[in-house]
Amino acid sequence: IFGSYDARHPNYNFSMYDPMWTVIQDCNLPITFHISTGRDPRAARKDGGAVINYVSHSLSPTIEPIANLCASGVIERYPKIKFAAIECGIGWVPWALDAMDEAYRKHHMWAYPKLPKMPSEYFRSNGATTFQEDRVGLDLAVKYNLVDNFMWANDYPHHEGSWPHSYQAIERQMGDLTEEQRAKILGLNAARVFNFDINALMSRRDTAVN
C-alpha cells in the first residue's frame, strides 16, 4: 500500500484508517510498503541526482510507514497484521528501532498513545524488510537479533537486483550465517509473512523435478 504523498494528507497513524485495518486483519492479509511509493522520489536534480534520489528519497521514506504502524498503536489494536517494507535494505532497521524507542522514552511528556510495549517490539513481532545486498545489515541482523525479520530478494528484473548472479550474491554476503539463519532469511521468513504453505510448495517442486 502507498504511504501519504505529502504532509497535507492523512497518514496511517490516523484513526480514519481503522476500518481498513479491521478488514486486513480479518482477512489475514499481509501488507507491504515498496520503496519510491507515496512521495515522489525524484526530488533532487543535476549532479548526483540519481544517487541522491535513490538513497534519500526512495529508501529513507520507508521508515515512515513502519513508524506509523509501530508508534501510533495500530499494531497494538490489530496484533495479527503482518507488514513488510520491500526493497529498502536492512542496515537501517536497528537504528530506526532504537530511534523510535528513544523518542518514545525521552519525549514521553507528549508521546501518545501510551503503549504497553516499546515501538520496536511491534516491528519485531509483526514486521519485516527485504534486501538484495546488504552485508552491513546482515552483520547487524545477528547482533540485534533481527534474523526473523529480514528477507532476501533478487529484485528481478531490475538492475539494482542480483539476477542472474543471485547465487554469487548470496554466498558473498551470507557466508558468516548459520544454515538455520540462512534458511530463515532466504525463504522461511517470507513463508511466514505471506502465509505460504511450505509443504505444499515443496511437494509441487518435487513433482516438477520428477
What are these regions (language model features)?
Residues 1-2, 31-33, 83-85, 127-131, ...:
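Hydrophobic faces of well-ordered beta-strands that scaffold small-molecule active sites
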Residues 13, 43-45, 97-99, 138-143:
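Distinct, well-ordered alpha-helical segments
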Residues 1-65, 72:
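Active-site gating/metal-coordination segments in enzymes
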Residues 6, 37-39, 89-90, 133-135:
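Active-site-proximal loop/turn and secondary-structure-junction residues that shape catalytic pockets
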Residues 72-73, 81, 91-92, 128, ...:
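Mid-to-C-terminal alpha-helical segments outside catalytic/metal-binding sites
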Residues 25-30, 48-51, 78-81, 123-128, ...:
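Glycine-enriched alpha-helix->loop->beta-strand junction motifs that scaffold or abut catalytic
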Residues 57-65, 108-139:
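Aromatic-anchored helix/helix-loop segment that forms the rim or "lid"
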Residues 31, 35-37, 71-120, 124:
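Aromatic-lined glycan-binding groove of carbohydrate-active enzymes
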